A protein has these predicted regions:
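Conserved ABC transporter NBD signature motif
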Residues: 75-83, 95
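Conserved ABC ATPase "signature" region
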Residues: 83, 128, 136-156, 265
Length: 329
């Protein structure tokens, strides 16, 4: 059992339900969609938890709900021991300075009308105006220069605008902005997926260096298993708003338990033909859609510890396993 002091973020039974559709006069076409189905996980201090899954599985919704950009339908989000779902707006603003987000697309996440200086100093200015983190102009200027050095950006860039930079430079600017308030936890939403492969490695290495230097914790989400493997200490596998498996990186890749995890790992491209994995689940199969509606519900299939630090849900376990066996024959 881990000491609570070693846990910076703890999510318990988090549910996020959205209502979609439209009303027009007497015609109503609305339905509820569960984007998150009672997920639970922990992020340890100075460590990285990778959250992996296909597009649309609920990864980004998880981060936005943790940040309270979407208020959760139910469940708890403990950050440094405080339940964020019960905080007032003022208390939430104070808490958010220790938890910041790096967004997926550096092209759209930076205001094109602001200079780099204005973008990076904006969090400092806002928290100064709200008297949460008072700073003089000189202190703000000093902090901006520190952030430029930390993220490998030249000070000569400060008076320029986002459109003048490459994707990699823009993401460095986004990281500098996220670090402005000296947070303890970064939520990284597909932080390198929009970048060229050559630039991707540079940003990942920068994040690793910053984690060591600043004692940061990361919740790192991606659909790319290779990237998650490189960055993470532990990995959680998500499917349709449900976490199916959590394990340390080495264990997850060497001994995956849930059939969905197995098929994700099998989907990683392999150069050596002798190592090519043949057992996969066709996720668009009609039978999978059917069993998703008739299977054991996520609420009745919590994560269970099958070995030390290795947790697996029974949700869709037997059904997906039968598809694996079917595809093998």
């Amino acid at each position: 059992m881990k000491n609570e002091k070693d846990i910076i973020l703890k999510v318990e039974n988090l549910v996020q339900t959205f209502t979609i559709g439209e009303d027009f006069l007497f015609w109503k076409n609305k339905r509820k969609v569960n984007a998150l189905n009672g997920i639970s996980f922990e992020v340890e201090r100075n460590k990285t938890l990778g959250l992996v899954g296909e597009s649309g599985c609920g990864k980004s919704t998880t981060l936005r709900t943790i940040m309270q950009l979407h208020r959760p339908t139910s469940g708890s989000i403990y950050f440094n021991g405080k339940d964020m779902t019960k905080l007032s707006k003022r208390e939430l603003l104070k808490t958010r300075k220790d938890m910041q987000m790096v967004f997926q697309d550096p092209h759209t996440s930076l205001n094109p009308r602001m200079t780099i200086r204005e973008i990076i100093e904006e969090p400092l200015v806002i928290y100064n105006e709200n008297k949460i983190l008072p700073k003089t102009k000189q202190e703000i200027e000093k902090r901006v220069n520190e952030l430029m050095n930390l993220t490998g950006l030249a000070k000569s860039m400060l008076s320029r605008y986002p459109h003048e930079f490459s994707g990699g430079q823009r993401q460095r600017i986004g990281i500098a902005r996220a670090l402005a308030l000296n947070p303890k936890l970064l939520l990284l939403d597909e932080a390198v997926s929009a970048l060229d492969v050559s630039i991707r490695a540079q940003i990942l290495n920068l994040l690793k260096d910053l984690q060591k230097e600043l004692s940061l914790s990361y919740l790192f989400i991606s659909h790319d298993l290779a990237v998650v493997k490189y960055m993470s200490d532990k990995i959680a596998v998500m499917y349709m708003g449900v976490i199916l498996e959590i394990a340390p990186r080495e264990i997850l890749f060497s001994n995956p338990k849930h059939p969905y995890t197995k098929t994700l790992i099998a989907s990683i491209p392999e150069i050596d033909p002798e190592k090519i994995k043949t057992k996969t689940i066709k996720l668009d199969e009609p039978s999978l859609t059917t069993i998703r509606n008739t299977s054991l519900t996520p609420e009745n299939a919590p994560l269970e510890e099958v070995e030390k630090d290795h947790f697996v849900s029974k949700y869709l376990f037997d059904e997906m396993n039968s598809l694996l066996n079917k595809n093998e024959t």
